[in-house]
C-alpha cells in the first residue's frame, strides 16, 4: 500500500525546512519514507558541517540512511527526542494516515515520544478527509481474527502482500500488516480508539492529534500548517 507521487523538489523543500529546525545538541527522531529521507540527507550535510545531534531511527531504512549520512544514533532507552521528523501517506485537518512502508508502529512510538513532531509532505498527500486504507500491524497468529474484527467495524481488510517475494509483508518487528479500507473516515479519533482495542493488533496507522506542524512542500516553497 505504499503511497507515492509528488515531485522530488517539493519533498526536498519540506525536508530541508524541517531539518533547518534542528539545533545543536538535539536528539532527532528520524522518520521513514521518501520525504523523511530528504530530511535525513539534509541533516547529514549539516552534521558534516559540524552540527552535533543524535538520531533515533524508526525503521531499517532510516537507520541505513542515517549511517550513510554519518549521523550518530541512539535509542529511546537512552534519550528522548527533542523533535521527530516524519512523513505521511495522507494528511487531513492535521491528522495523518501512515504505514505505507510498514513502519508505523515504530514511527508512532518515536513521534509520540518527541517534544515536537514535524510532519513533512508534498502536495499530493493533502486531502479534505482521510480516506485511504488504514494499515494495522498485527501479530502473525492474530491476522485472521483481526480481519474479522475489522470487517465487523465496517472495514474491508486485506493482508498486505510482499512485492518482491511470495507471501505477506513482514515488518521490522516480525509482524504482518492488514490494510483496512473504511472509505471516508468521518471520525478518525473514534476509529483510532476502536482499532487500538482490537486484540492482536500491535499498532494502527492513524496518527490523530500528534502533529505539531505540517510542512508541505510546494512548487514555490513550503506551506506550514
UniProtKB/Swiss-Prot annotation:
Does the keyword Isomerase belong to this entry?
A: yes
UniProt-annotated catalytic positions: 107
Tell me one GO biological process term.
D-ribose metabolic process
Task: Write down what this protein is called.
Answer: Ribose-5-phosphate isomerase A
Specify the signal sequence span.
none
Pathway, per record: Carbohydrate degradation; pentose phosphate pathway; D-ribose 5-phosphate from D-ribulose 5-phosphate (non-oxidative stage): step 1/1
Instruction: Report the catalytic activity.
Output: aldehydo-D-ribose 5-phosphate = D-ribulose 5-phosphate
InterPro entries with a match to the protein in the record: NagB/RpiA_transferase-like, Ribose5P_isomerase_typA_subgr, Ribose5P_isomerase_type_A
* Pfam families found in the cross-reference section: Rib_5-P_isom_A (PF06026)
Keyword Ligase tagged? no
Region span, Disordered:
1-20
Q: Which SUPFAM superfamilies match?
A: D-ribose-5-phosphate isomerase (RpiA), lid domain, NagB/RpiA/CoA transferase-like
Which residues are listed for substrate binding in this entry? 32-35, 86-89, 98-101, 125
Q: Which UniProt keywords apply?
A: Isomerase
Which species?
A: Natronomonas pharaonis (strain ATCC 35678 / DSM 2160 / CIP 103997 / JCM 8858 / NBRC 14720 / NCIMB 2260 / Gabara) (Halobacterium pharaonis)
Q: What is its EC number?
A: 5.3.1.6
Quaternary structure annotation from Swiss-Prot or TrEMBL: Homodimer.
Family of this protein: Belongs to the ribose 5-phosphate isomerase family.
One Gene Ontology MF term = ribose-5-phosphate isomerase activity
Q: Name one GO cellular component term.
A: cytosol
Q: What class of enzyme is it?
A: isomerase
What is this protein's function?
Catalyzes the reversible conversion of ribose-5-phosphate to ribulose 5-phosphate.
This protein's superkingdom? Archaea
